[in-house]
Amino acid sequence: MRPKVLIVDDSGLSRRTLRRILETGDYEVVEAEDGMTALEVYFLEKPRLVLLDLVMKGMYGLDVLVKLREMDPKALVVIASADIQSSTRKMVDDAGALGFINKPFVSEQVLMAVKAALAEGATSETN
C-alpha cells in the first residue's frame, strides 16, 4: 500500500508541483488549500505524512502544525517554505516538525525529506 501524503499549500502551483514529485515517488496524494481544510482532510483521509506550507491565508502553517500535534501527537509533518531563516527552522522544530523543504522545490530533496520523515515516524512507533 502506497503511503498517503497530505499537501497543504494555498498555492495551486506548489500543490501541483509537489503532487507531481510525490506521485513519481509512488506516494498517494491528497490536498488542502488552507489550514482549516487541512485539519478536516487529515482526520478524514488519515495521511501518513503532511507537507505543510508556513505562509497561508487564514491559518498560519505553524498554527496548523501545533493544532495537528495537539489532536494527534504522532502526526508526521514536514514544513515546505521559502523562509529559510534559522529562527523559523527552530520554531517549527520546537513545534514538532520532522523536516524542512525549501521552496522552490527540488524533486530529490522533497523525496529525501519525505522518506526520512516516514522512516523517523516508523522508528518512533516501534519504540
Where are the predicted features?
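The feature encodes the CheY-like receiver
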Residues: 57-58, 85
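Active-site beta3 strand of CheY-like receiver
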Residues: 45-51
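Receiver (REC) domain switch/active-site region of two-component response regulators
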Residues: 106
